[in-house]
Amino acid sequence: MVAIGIDLGTTYSCFGVFQHGKVEIIANDQGNRTTPSYVAFTDSERLIGDAAKNQVAMNPKNTVFDAKRLIGRKYDDPKIMEDVKHWPFKVVSDGGKPKISVEYKEENKQFAPEEISSMVLTKMKETAEVILGTTVTDAVITVPAYFNDSQRQATKDAGRIAGLNVLRIINEPTAAALAYGLDKNLKGERNVLIFDLGGGTFDVSILTIDEGSLFEVRATAGDTHLGEDFDNRLVSHLAEEFKRKYKKDLRSNPRALRRLRTAAERAKRTLSSSTEATIEIDALFEGIDLYTKVSRARFEELCADLFRQTLEPVEKALNDAKMDKNQIHVYVLVGGSTRIPKVQRLLQSFFCGKSLNLSINPDEAVAYGAAVQAAILSGDKSTEIQDVLLVDVAPLSLGIETAGGVMAKIIERNCRIPCKQTQTFSTYSDNQPGVNIQVYEGERVMTKDNNRLGTFDLSGIPPAPRGVPQIEVTFDVDANGNNLNVSAKEMSSGNAKNITIKNDKGRLSQAEIDRMVNEAGRYAEEDERQRNKIAARNNLESYVLAVKQAWTTLVDKLSEREKSEVTKACDDTIKWLDATRLADKEEYEDKMNTLTKLCTPIMTKLHSGGGAGQGASCGQQAGGFNGGHTGPTVEEVD
């Protein structure tokens, strides 16, 4: 069974497969090796990937992107509140969970972020199955290193909705390190810093790679934003410039804003290789054209603070790994935003002018590593990967709430996983019969500032003064980093409680996942019906045009009655096609059958009775340049 590796990105996604001893990044149906993480809904169909992004300016309110910024978060998350300002689509609260509200087939529909992500995953799964010629169910999906438990589990849920068995969720910089280590066939021990600045998130990881096969993550740090924020700065600047020049605020118009964002994204890419980018948009707002230039220096000034922010996680990762700058041997850049020259200069300056490694494709490295890990987990015995061992770390500290709402950390951030840690606690008051254990993840001192994962009660504690009972709390994290077993045991009585934390806060219930799986199947059937409708329409249209072309070429072979019948039938069909936006497949087939019954005898008569004439006509056309000769008009040159 083939397993694929998927880099589910904020703005673009990429996937690959390890086979025949190497990784192959799979191109989508448009021939592109990255697929926009976009899903669009129209009054007739659902579009995913390139097709969705290509029509975004025409349909901004019903084209969804950035689902990764919503996944696993609560609606009232401050970061979501900030992001909503930049999105043309509507985000609503459903029991505290964010849902995306769109118009689909003239009905209002609400989708969870997991559903939108699952649609992108489904698109990649289907493409992989076509290319590989086999059913694909197993996959490794990557997430930013700084994703919390809710976000990781929600990503796993998206995979399940898409019909995938998610073998493992791995960190993006770790996957990139796998790609680098295997690609370079390293010898000896090397400390590698992965600087991953993508379309929506930012991660830094430090790994030690031993003999190109043992990959040990030493520390990880990051920011679940950045990347696309550069676009936002440029869009704001251009919108302000437009307002200053023409005294009109285009930000009130979603379509104009989307067109401006597309142009800004293109300009940002241009500025990575040129010192100036030209932005030209016809009739951007109220018939006014936008024509302006943006220099690289201006762009760097607009994003200066964001660029500087990228160095903070670098310093944090170095401190956590207990390493000095000089101990890093290689600096690997991953993610499209690392192409920005200012980012490269800042990082190079931070590391005292040492050269950066730009040798791996920043758009594909994460998917490459995910494909390798997928092959390993699915039991591939290829010599290239048989010795590869990946040792990751817990991205966030795990602990419990103690008196006063203070977080007591049991597993520290950047602790190697799998790991198991135990600490002893006691009661807060005299004769306390039980304790409520609340499990959190995060780095803040107070639990209210961290992310609650779950809670359970340990009862049956024998009466005793406060501080006397000894309660052992054990945290056990598996190699995936997303299965956490927590146990508590009162030592004198032996009473114990053991649970597996399943973070339901902000997550989908099993019933919701089952419903979404069924809906995904229904949407896939609707998509197939839509494809069949379009194919039937195209067949009918092609047939009508072919008939018209044939009889106009050989019109002298038809009687007046036949000419009239064919002309009327073809014209009526073309009018019907123009007036009917999208009928049922059966209607197209009925029209096709009716037209075929009328035209087939006439077409047969044309071709049987007019074969010589048709040949002569073609001969005259072909021979128009050489005095009517029907021989070839070109000659082979030695």
Curated annotation (Swiss-Prot):
Induction, as annotated: By heat shock.
InterPro entries the record matches: ATPase_NBD (IPR043129), Heat_shock_70_CS (IPR018181), HSP70_C_sf (IPR029048), HSP70_peptide-bd_sf (IPR029047), Hsp_70_fam (IPR013126)
A Pfam family it matches: HSP70
Disulphide bridges, residue numbers: none
Superkingdom to which the source organism belongs: Eukaryota
PROSITE patterns (alphabetical): HSP70_1 (PS00297), HSP70_2 (PS00329), HSP70_3 (PS01036)
An example molecular function term from Gene Ontology annotations: ATP binding
Keywords of this entry: ATP-binding, Nucleotide-binding, Stress response
Mitochondrion found in the keyword field: no
Family under the similarity heading: Belongs to the heat shock protein 70 family.
Name this polypeptide is given: Heat shock protein 70
Organism taxonomic ancestry: Eukaryota, Metazoa, Ecdysozoa, Arthropoda, Hexapoda
